[in-house]
Design a protein with these regions (language model features):
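C-terminal and late-domain segments of enzyme folds
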Residues: 4-17, 21-25, 103-105, 109-207
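Conserved strand-to-helix beginnings and helix N-cap segments that scaffold or border functional pockets
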Residues: 12-13, 43, 69-72, 138-139
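Short, flexible, glycine/charge-rich loop motifs used to bind or transfer phosphoryl groups or to couple energy/partner
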Residues: 44-47, 79, 115-117, 145
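Portal/gating segments that form or line small-molecule/metal binding sites
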Residues: 6-65
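General beta-strand structural signal in soluble alpha/beta enzymes
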Residues: 31-34, 57-58, 89-92, 155-158
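Class I SAM-dependent methyltransferase SAM-binding "motif I" and its flanking Rossmann-like core
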Residues: 59, 65-136
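Mature, structured domains of secreted/extracytosolic soluble proteins
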Residues: 47, 53-55, 64-85, 196-201, ...
Length: 207
């Protein structure tokens, strides 16, 4: 819900409740972190919530706003440590798009202002959530985004209701549609059940 906090309490609560309802339907106890601002991300009691967590999930909203809230904060530093120790990270929409060096400001009105700094945890990579419907929102968006992928970088487009699940190096596609990978100018598309060998370069590994 952090990525939607700037939209107001109704939006934040809506995303939070969706998450609680989803995990509740699976019989999994879940808690919404009180993480709306950079001040929250500096509070020891928020980072302490990671202790004993079995997973962390960031939902949708504006990925640039999410990055602004957490990048360079004690919360994110603690989360990186937890991920290295084995804590699973899951994200949909903004929750995955925020992870890279640059991300999308989804409040922007045109392509010229769409790019913003991301968290920079996943390097040399760009994610494209909602890949199969992005052009219905902004005509020409898929061509623009794919054309913005840096030389030597990897682009990963994730269709609606589709996920890639793995250990950071090997992945399996789950869902109704596909994952689209652009590497060295070549597209490869993967459907449900197919495996992707794609190690994601992480900032903490490069340090």
């Amino acid at each position: 819900a952090t990525a939607s906090a700037h939209e107001g309490e109704a939006s934040y609560d809506g995303w939070a409740n969706k998450g609680l309802e989803h995990y509740g339907s699976l019989g999994i106890a879940a808690e919404v972190l009180p993480l709306k601002t950079r001040e929250d991300a500096h509070r020891d009691e928020v980072a302490a919530k990671l202790d004993g967590a079995s997973a962390i999930f960031f939902s949708g909203g504006n990925p640039a706003r999410l990055a602004q809230v957490v990048v360079g904060t004690p919360f994110w530093a603690a989360l990186e440590i937890a991920i290295r120790a084995g804590l699973p990270y899951a994200g949909c929409s903004a929750g995955v798009a925020c992870l890279t060096d640059k991300t999308y400001d989804s409040d922007s009105q045109d392509f010229d202002s769409i790019w913003a700094p991301g968290i920079g945890y996943v390097r040399d990579t760009l994610f494209g959530p909602h890949w199969d419907i992005v052009d219905t929102w902004i005509p020409g968006a898929t061509d623009f985004i794919a054309g913005s992928v840096g030389l030597g970088d990897t682009f990963i487009g994730l269709d609606e209701d589709t996920a890639m699940v793995g250990d950071g190096r090997s992945w399996e596609v789950i869902g109704r549609a596909k994952v689209h990978v652009l590497r060295e100018g070549e597209w490869t598309r993967y459907a449900e059940g197919e495996e992707i060998e794609l190690p994601l370069p992480l900032a903490d590994e490069a340090a």
